[in-house]
Amino acid sequence: MSDQPGTSRPPLRAEPTPTKTATRRRARPIAIPSDETPRNEVTFLRPSEVPQRKPLPEYREPQPRKTVPKNVPLEDLHNYHREECLNVSIPHFINTEDLIKESQRVNGLISFRSTNFVDPSVILKEIKKKEEETVTLMDNDKNSIIDIVGDGINYEKLKKVEKSLCQIDIITEFMNRSRHLQGKKVNGCIMRIDETKQLLFHVIIDGPVGSIYEGGTFFADINIQPYQNHSLIPRVCFHTFIFHPNLGKYGNWDMRGIQWERRSNLEVLYNFIVEGMRNVKYDIERRNLAQLEDMSQPNISRLAKEDWPKFERTAREFVMKMAGGTINGRKTIFAETKKRRRQDFLDEDIDVIGIS
């Protein structure tokens, strides 16, 4: 190269080949404008420096209710409506459909309140007449008449008293219908009334003759509970285990299907339980799979449906073990004490988890 100054040509730029196109993406802005930069400073202002907001508009209390004069035509109701008025009362009755038609005719909002005009003196007379009524109640225990006369009658308390007295009537009628069964064996069942608890009966049930539970003695409690519609609901709880699909985990017998009425007595319960023990095979055969799963012990009901000989053999074994049954005419160890309740089974669950 020469050190002498001279003219030189600028370097030639390389032209892009036509086959390749260079694409350049637009750079994403990363700088935050100065007016939008976050401020982390905390500034303490004096009370005089705090900016004051604009005062709220003055509140105007709406006018009291406005009453339309009596017998105003329906076409003139819209003349009495004002925005500053709280409510507009109509002293005579107007059908809602007529108000809707009037609103459509006026092409506006109708906000009237339609009320029936009643003379206050008539209402006052009705109230006094109601308070002066004498309510007579018959007490079943003391056979006395209770007179409750007006001046501050508590009608809610009065309804509770009537309900309790009605329940007493139902309980007394049931006890009178069932008391003759005490100490008598009816359909293989004998009961004793619990003197400490009302409507509690201790029952001893003999296994039905000809059934798979024959020879066993089963102890149960029958509890009658009042219900809200002036009726009684029976509940049966066994203290002796029965290999039966209607017996629940805690000894409760399934009461669905019982023909129980207000005039029923304990004999209806006896027949229902005994027939359920005697006709267990027929009851299982007529049920479908969903009904078997709905029973108290689905595993036992499935066994009875699929393998009846095994179910029958297992049920007889439990009768001999738990209910003092007999083997070939000879009494087992538990048969000697079959009339005495076994206390060691009172507080235990009698559920069968698996069957081998």
Curated annotation (Swiss-Prot):
InterPro entries per record: UBQ-conjugat_E2_core, UBQ-conjugating_enzyme/RWD
GO cellular component terms given for this protein: axon; cilium; cytoplasm; dendrite; nucleus
Basic and acidic residues biased stretches: 63-76
Bias type Polar residues, positions: 18-32
Superkingdom assignment: Eukaryota
Assigned protein family: Belongs to the ubiquitin-conjugating enzyme family.
Protein name listed in UniProt: Ubiquitin-conjugating enzyme E2 variant 3
